[in-house]
Amino acid sequence: MLMDPVADMLTRVRNAQRVGRSFVIMPSSNQKKAIAEVLKEEGYIQSFEIKGDKKPELTIYLKYYQGRPVIETIKRVSRPGLRIFRNKDQLPRVQSGLGIAIISTSKGVMSDHKARELGVGGEVICMVA
């Protein structure tokens, strides 16, 4: 049994991009789907899809630019043993605004840019650059 499914997702994406895979498959969950939606909106992945009824699987299609992965770093911030919450004024800026932080808020999972626009804070799930 996995203790941190989101960290597992991020590790699968990181490892798949390092070896040049075009897609990665993993067990699906609502939070993983929401994270994949943010990654797609921000242009870090090509697309994603969910297949299966009893045990749904999330397939993420990775994105490369001139043969290099678009995602240079993807790092878990808040974890089960140490939750990291930030209010709207304390939201992190990743690489001076060139990267994103994915935030779980009361209004859903979103990028730090969108959370600032809406004036909400929340749990900092991960950082992507």
Curated annotation (Swiss-Prot):
Statement: the UniProt record of this protein carries the keyword Ribosomal protein: yes
Signal peptide location: none
Origin: domain of life: Bacteria
Keyword Protein biosynthesis: no
SUPFAM superfamilies: Ribosomal protein S8 (SSF56047)
InterPro entries on file: Ribosomal_uS8 (IPR000630), Ribosomal_uS8_CS (IPR047863), Ribosomal_uS8_sf (IPR035987)
Keywords: Ribonucleoprotein, Ribosomal protein, RNA-binding, rRNA-binding
GO BP term (any one): translation
Function: One of the primary rRNA binding proteins, it binds directly to 16S rRNA central domain where it helps coordinate assembly of the platform of the 30S subunit.
Oligomer and partners: Part of the 30S ribosomal subunit. Contacts proteins S5 and S12.
NCBIfam families tied to this protein: PRK00136.1 (NF001109)
Protein family per UniProt: Belongs to the universal ribosomal protein uS8 family.
Protein name, as recorded: Small ribosomal subunit protein uS8
Organism classification: Bacteria, Pseudomonadati, Pseudomonadota, Gammaproteobacteria, Cardiobacteriales
